[in-house]
Amino acid sequence: MTAASNAAETIGVAVADAPERERYEIHVDGELAGFTEYKTRRGIIAFIHTEVDEGFQGRGLGDRLIAYALDDARKRGLAVLPFCPFVRSFIQSHPDYVDLVPESQRGAFEL
């Protein structure tokens, strides 16, 4: 996925930040399919937990959600702390996102 906008939409799939709920959400045909929760503070976004509803698993929606969230963090100039194992695993598998994690924190996250 390329740089994030306010919402990314592809044939019935939409991803957007829901700051009032402190999470990014992915919807399929208008139905909430998953989310990744975060906390922000002083130029940092910490990803805490990611969930994709069982009925939507196996479609790559989690990866799309996290790519969008990380692209948005980059656009906003936020450093990333991947406390969520899914986000951490995504970054390990997509090294072009490692630079979002402060160098001093990479060892703690096995990056």
Spans of model-derived segments:
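N-terminal first-folded block
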Residues: 2-50
